[in-house]
């Protein structure tokens, strides 16, 4: 076993509180040295508390800097009322945080606003970052914080008839704390009435002087919607004048669950955030918890985690590529792709014991070591897959009909992608080579040799799918390096917060058994702090922002998923296109609704 390490031993870019980050000096030069409170955390970025009346001015300043913060990566809230470890922070009953990214600096900053329960108002950020729209709606819905000036502050995850704000600390977290649910005929009629679309509520006109618009309800059970997703189309003939995406049908309260599960027992829930990603989704969570605990895992653990993540990346990409081809009209490739995916599942099952949702990563390591014969199975897959991928490209993706349906369709540039918070292949198709595995390596990715495919400046449906093909080839390349260079050593860090003590130690020191009993029964107690980890997931950047209050459970678990941002962008991209183009566009985004709704 390796020795446990301290917080300072982790990679510098991940752990420095960035109190010396140049942006802090820039802000103080512009707004004065007393304008902010800088909060030390383990997020790896400067965390700055600003006053509500200065928020928009600060955000605009950051966006117009020579190396600007061009993307609003995340926005949400925290109920601070029960938090005990708040020394040095502004008094607050609630807070709102804004996570901004500068591509040119490859740096982030988090702005926080402290709010009193008597005055839960903050100005909307939609005039600075248009993608703040959905994030503010969800924050209002979950916490009751009003964003003054928001164009349509309404529920987004919960039914319109829902009462209360679920992420408040005084809101029940378990079904047993509610009265039994009874669906009467009257309540059913009320719920159905609430689903009726009223164009005027969204600033839409029912028609012009000469003709009426048609409103088409696509979903939430349409096969081309890729899940329980509804989108209302305002049509002039077959042309889309405008549209309104309607999400939330797959919402399961994943962030609320994080407040009622131990640090360890929450791992299975991470698999189901994006149910095709498997171990990929476990990665940011366990890395964020390891930052809180100050754990450095062995090299073997890093490499095993990378190997499992890339297997699931290939698995997800194969489904995406084949269903995209199916959406355009070709049925055969999807059946071939499932044969390939079965080989991956056989390999994953041999290693982890499970298929889609292994829940196999652990805080400080993995559940168990690699089994005998794993290398043979991986080698057979690496010999099999390249030829199959070539056949998909030759037989389907270079087909003139497919290209005619997808080239130039649903196109956007880099500026538009950044405005809407697009990440993953959609952003890289615009020519921006932002891949977290390269730009902000985690779990040893800096030790692997692979390329980041990029587009030529415009992200259209065809470019997005072809980039995924190239990403799949690079994942095969990474897997080959895992096969040939798997380090020796333990599969867990020797750390009291995560790993049972060796038997010989328990025979000498009774305290080790007491500690082990508490860890297993109540769960480990993580130091009070905040941590953050983003990763390059299958559909874009996925991240976990964890707040520990020195307890066995997370005080606040914020899950930022790429698909949420990507669906918000749909109206801006598809206006003026045909309904048939929308179907191809939806197929090119690569999303599942569990990733959107959490």
From Swiss-Prot:
Designated name of the protein: NADH-quinone oxidoreductase subunit C/D
What function does this protein fulfil? NDH-1 shuttles electrons from NADH, via FMN and iron-sulfur (Fe-S) centers, to quinones in the respiratory chain. The immediate electron acceptor for the enzyme in this species is believed to be ubiquinone. Couples the redox reaction to proton translocation (for every two electrons transferred, four hydrogen ions are translocated across the cytoplasmic membrane), and thus conserves the redox energy in a proton gradient.
Q: How does it assemble?
A: NDH-1 is composed of 13 different subunits. Subunits NuoB, CD, E, F, and G constitute the peripheral sector of the complex.
Against HAMAP family, the record matches this protein to:
NDH1_NuoC, NDH1_NuoCD_1, NDH1_NuoD
Q: Which GO terms describe its molecular function?
A: NAD binding; NADH dehydrogenase (ubiquinone) activity; NADH:ubiquinone reductase (non-electrogenic) activity; quinone binding
How does the record classify its membrane topology? Peripheral membrane protein
Which GO CC terms are listed, alphabetically? NADH dehydrogenase complex; plasma membrane
The gene name reads nuoC
Which locations, inside or outside the cell, does it occupy? Cell inner membrane
**Source organism's superkingdom?**
Bacteria
Listed NCBIfam families:
NuoC_fam (TIGR01961), NuoD (TIGR01962), PRK06075.1 (NF004739), PRK11742.1 (NF008728)
Q: Which family does it belong to?
A: In the N-terminal section; belongs to the complex I 30 kDa subunit family.
Q: Which Pfam families match?
A: Complex1_30kDa, Complex1_49kDa
Look up the EC number in the record and give it. Answer: 7.1.1.-
Keywords attached to this Swiss-Prot or TrEMBL record, sorted alphabetically, are: Cell inner membrane, Cell membrane, Membrane, Multifunctional enzyme, NAD, Quinone, Translocase, Transport, Ubiquinone
Q: Which parts of the sequence are annotated with region: NADH dehydrogenase I subunit C?
A: 1-188
Looking up InterPro entries in the UniProt record yields:
NADH_DH_suC, NADH_DH_suCD, NADH_Q_OxRdtase_suD, NADH_quin_OxRdtase_su_C/D-like, NADH_UbQ_OxRdtase_30kDa_su, NADH_UbQ_OxRdtase_49kDa_CS, NDH1_su_D/H, NiFe-Hase_large
What reaction does this catalyse?
A: a quinone + NADH + 5 H(+)(in) = a quinol + NAD(+) + 4 H(+)(out)
Residue ranges of region NADH dehydrogenase I subunit D?
212-598
Taxonomically, what lineage is the organism?
Answer: Bacteria, Pseudomonadati, Pseudomonadota, Gammaproteobacteria, Enterobacterales
